[in-house]
């Protein structure tokens, strides 16, 4: 038996959380991304993980104003590149804050937030009232694994994969399914080689939390053409290096959490194709081109349309 039932969203208890206009992130993203429905005009987000950060950016693309985002921890738990996209769009991000209540008569009309101390308790006198018509709750996921646990207690030969086994990014869930599928096939008698140790290492890399943030560095020259990387946090990501037709962008394939760098020794081979700019999911690559003017560069920036 393979259990790959995914995860469910965690709920959050606060006054007014049953008012119309309080959404889980999954329902909100389904409406916006799949059904192309604009469910609100003025959104406030609770939770600074990747789900909340990405949902906020999707809302902006759908023409929805994001009035703010609240995160109880001192820093957002999601990738910095996703947080930066919201910050560049002018979204206020309130770290070390929590939601106290949603206000409204027949629907959400505003939200009350407050700063928290180190024990995550609200600090009196720090309350803020923010107008909004919708609250998006994105405070984490938990595995849908009840059936898995029951199967184990009665002695069934059972496996789990993806978020039903461990909450992680989608890429990690897909890779864990590949590993477990291989294990099951061997158990059923298929003549397959042992799972390479590199697969297990890759799975751990894909499941890893955001790493350290390093100071942003720049190429100090006024000639030629070259990319500038604005990703300064170690996360498992390598699209920019994989699409470069000249192999001028390098990320250590043994551990794709390492930051990318441009091979300046071969900089004259760059053809300014812009693929690295277009492919970056964090919009964290720009292209600087001094070939026409030595003192004024043509800069290509990533923009995602509504």
Q: At which residue positions do the language-model features occur?
A:
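Residues forming the flavin
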Residues: 1-306
């Amino acid at each position: 038996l393979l259990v790959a039932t995914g995860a469910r969203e965690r709920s959050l208890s606060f006054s007014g959380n049953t008012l119309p206009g309080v959404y889980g992130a999954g329902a909100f993203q389904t409406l916006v991304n799949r059904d192309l429905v604009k469910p609100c005009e003025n959104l406030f987000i609770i939770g600074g993980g990747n789900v909340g950060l990405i949902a906020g950016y999707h809302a902006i693309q759908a023409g929805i104003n994001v009035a703010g985002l609240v995160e109880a921890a001192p820093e957002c738990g999601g990738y910095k590149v996703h947080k930066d996209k919201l910050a560049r769009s002018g979204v206020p991000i309130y770290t070390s804050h929590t939601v106290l209540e949603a206000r409204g008569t027949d629907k959400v009309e505003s939200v009350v937030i407050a700063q928290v101390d180190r024990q995550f308790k609200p600090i009196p006198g720090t309350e803020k009232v923010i107008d909004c018509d919708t609250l998006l709750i994105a405070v984490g996921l938990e595995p849908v694994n009840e059936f898995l646990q029951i199967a184990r207690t009665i002695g069934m030969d059972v496996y789990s994969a993806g978020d039903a086994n461990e909450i992680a990014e989608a890429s990690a869930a897909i890779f864990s399914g590949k590993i477990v599928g291989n294990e099951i096939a061997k158990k059923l008698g298929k003549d397959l080689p042992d799972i390479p140790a590199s697969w297990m290492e890759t799975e751990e890399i894909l499941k890893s939390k955001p790493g350290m943030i390093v100071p942003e560095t720049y190429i100090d020259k006024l000639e030629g053409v070259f990319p500038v990387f604005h990703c300064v946090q170690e996360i498992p990501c390598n699209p920019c290096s994989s699409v470069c037709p000249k192999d001028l962008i390098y990320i250590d394939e043994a551990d794709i959490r390492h930051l990318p760098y441009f091979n300046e020794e071969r900089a004259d081979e760059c053809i300014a194709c812009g693929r690295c700019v277009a492919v970056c999911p964090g919009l964290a690559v720009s292209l600087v081109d001094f070939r026409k003017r030595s003192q004024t560069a043509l800069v290509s920036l990533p923009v995602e349309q509504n």
